[in-house]
């Protein structure tokens, strides 16, 4: 009897005390957090020797601040969500674990074909030189939302080019009471750096670009920047577009604006705001010189202060997150993109796409997706460009003054990056 008891105790100790713990900080709340918790639960059930503890920190700002504070105090999780510019900043402290040795491990690694199955833009966003520091997680692309009922009633086709967008915006804008202020706007945009960057990329320009020495240089003082700023000024001066800093899904649902560009992550809000009022749809962003668009979203990084067994366990979970079935499950249940091409062949994705014809439309742009620069000062540079954009369209400064100041400020931050 004593021998049996000791055997049971040994089994229990292995079950409850022998599992390797992986602490995972994230910023996924609401239904997205519930989906993530289900993925974590499934992983833990299928990996009895590993326990992943998912810890919701709060929004992205809260997560970023906690990571920076944790880096200073030496109190970091095993893995965390992180934007590429966060990773770039943390790399300066040499606390982010390179993943190549885990990827190439004969027992727990992945093949070259499996890694190349991850969409190229997402792979590139996780790689510095030849070193992989992250795996992609919650990714979204920009798409054009439109009021299908209104466009159909007006006999307007969905714009496929910038010129068609201008034509449609003008044709759809209505001043019903003739007071000089439109009651319905054909197009709307947010006065954010994201809006400016989307159109700058479509025009073929960049905020920064790589120089001959492999370092980023300012590219904001360009003809493309001037054309994009002029484009938005024309929209506002012609009163065929509505602009505000906040999200546009509510006024879209009210029928006040009929087209706008935002990420696919906003779909649920559009569905809620427009339900029972009109039919909506989405389409790839219009072509200007290109259809290149930035993608949004975070990756998962591992910290080097973890124990070796924790790192290997963490890699198992990271590998699980980007497996075709799991990334497809994540995408179908959250509205984000699957990160691997083979995920589109999974049963869960095929069934979802069959019942939801909108699901695969954003993927028409996946090969045109462009990543943000991997700069630790990218947030600061974005703030500079946001100021330039807002000051100009609000008439605070003329175009040349706005651009020259932005160029000067961006160059200062790039000096800081490479000092």
Question: What kind of feature is each model-predicted range?
Answer:
Residues 29-51, 385, 403:
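Short, polar/charged alpha-helical segment
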Residues 38, 42-118, 149-160, 258-259, ...:
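Extracytoplasmic "Venus flytrap"/periplasmic binding protein-like
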Residues 84-141, 166, 199-201, 275, ...:
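Hinge/lid segment of periplasmic solute-binding proteins
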Residues 20-29, 50-55, 79, 317:
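Short, well-ordered beta-strand elements
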Residues 145-148, 296-309:
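A bilobed periplasmic-binding-protein/Venus flytrap-type ligand-binding module shared by bacterial periplasmic
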Residues 116-117, 280-283, 332-387, 391, ...:
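Long, aromatic- and glycine/proline-rich binding clefts that accommodate carbohydrate-like moieties
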Residues 124-137, 142, 166-216, 257:
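Extracytoplasmic/periplasmic solute-binding protein
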């Amino acid at each position: 009897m004593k021998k049996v008891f000791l055997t049971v105790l040994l089994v229990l100790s292995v079950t409850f005390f022998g599992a390797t713990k992986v602490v995972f900080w994230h910023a996924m709340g609401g239904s997205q957090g519930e989906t993530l918790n289900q993925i974590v639960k499934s992983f833990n059930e299928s990996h009895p020797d590993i326990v992943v503890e998912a810890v919701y920190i709060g929004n992205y700002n809260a997560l970023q601040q906690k990571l920076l504070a944790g880096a200073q105090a030496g109190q970091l999780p095993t893995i965390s969500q992180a934007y590429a510019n966060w990773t770039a900043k943390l790399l300066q402290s040499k606390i982010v674990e390179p993943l190549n040795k885990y990827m190439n491990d004969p027992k727990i690694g992945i093949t070259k074909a499996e890694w190349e199955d991850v969409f190229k833009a997402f792979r590139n966003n996780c790689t510095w030189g030849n070193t992989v520091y992250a795996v992609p997680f919650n990714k979204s692309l920009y798409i054009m939302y439109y009021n299908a009922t209104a466009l159909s009633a007006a006999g307007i086709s969905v714009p496929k080019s910038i010129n068609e967008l201008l034509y449609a915006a003008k044709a759809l804008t209505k001043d019903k009471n003739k007071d000089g202020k439109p009651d319905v706007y054909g197009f709307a945009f947010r006065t954010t750096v994201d809006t400016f960057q989307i159109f700058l990329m479509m025009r073929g320009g960049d905020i920064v670009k790589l120089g001959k020495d492999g370092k980023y240089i300012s590219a904001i003082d360009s003809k493309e920047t001037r054309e994009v700023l002029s484009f938005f000024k024309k929209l506002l001066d012609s009163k065929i577009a509505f602009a505000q800093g906040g999200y546009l899904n509510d006024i879209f649902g009210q029928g006040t604006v009929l087209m706008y560009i935002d990420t696919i992550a906003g779909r649920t809000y559009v569905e809620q705001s427009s339900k029972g009022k009109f039919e909506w749809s989405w389409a790839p962003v219009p072509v200007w010189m290109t259809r290149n668009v930035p993608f949004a979203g975070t990756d998962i990084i591992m910290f080097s202060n973890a124990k070796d067994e924790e790192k290997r366990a963490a890699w198992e979970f990271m590998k699980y997150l980007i497996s075709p079935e799991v990334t497809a499950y994540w995408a179908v249940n959250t509205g984000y993109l699957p990160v691997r091409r083979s995920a589109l062949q999974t049963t869960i994705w095929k069934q979802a796409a069959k019942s939801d014809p909108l699901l695969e439309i954003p993927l028409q742009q996946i090969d045109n997706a462009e990543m943000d620069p991997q700069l630790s000062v990218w947030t600061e540079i974005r703030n500079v460009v946001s100021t330039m954009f807002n000051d100009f369209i609000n008439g605070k400064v003329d175009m040349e003054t706005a651009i020259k100041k932005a160029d000067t400020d961006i160059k200062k931050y790039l000096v800081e990056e490479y000092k």
